Amino acid sequence: MKTPLRYPGGKSRAVPKLCQWLPENITEYREPFLGGGSMAIEMTKRYPDIPIWVNDLYKPLYLFWLALRDDGDYLYDQLIQLKQRHPDQGSARQLFLDAKEKVNEDDLSYKD
């Protein structure tokens, strides 16, 4: 499985190199800057039985990953419906621009 997100500064191409430096006996993994999640996804494949903690300061991104983890089937169904309601490139682009504007308007940094 690859990350469903393209993320600036992502680690997807660096994962093989990073994994060369992992210690032999890993008992947990913590990812403070989740982003596109490439390294965390790789760790779940390599070490399916260890606890994995992830975090990201950018709330929309963090909430996306929570939704994918906790309710992936529902998220998938919603995305399919969006695609059906916006079948052409122009409509899909406008949906993207509207969503981008909404995200940029709100202060969505996670501050608890």
Question: Which residue ranges define each predicted feature?
Answer:
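S-adenosyl-L-methionine
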Residues: M1-L34, S38-M39, R46-Y47
